[in-house]
Amino acid sequence: MRDQEVLEEVKSTLALLTAKAPGRAIEVRVPPYAAVQCGDGPTHTRGTPANVIEMSAPTWLALAKGEIAWADALNNGDIIASGVRADLSEYLPLRIQS
């Protein structure tokens, strides 16, 4: 995939995530493409959030499509997650329209 295609797919799948998991308790980062806040729970307004998840675009897209399980990606070191709510397994995979 080219960068523009990756950017569009990352943003559209993150939008699906925020629709499925509204809130601002978890910050999900897919550098350099996008970052969103989602998930129910305490929110933050300044500084580094308490619950942060970061991963590459290929990892995020594989999770969103159900090509890899959350636990497997986490155990493989493909996800950096910190905080008690830093877990997206209940929201994945996403329903992606072709």
Question: Where are the regions that the model predicts?
Answer:
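Feature captures hydrophobic
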Residues: 1-98
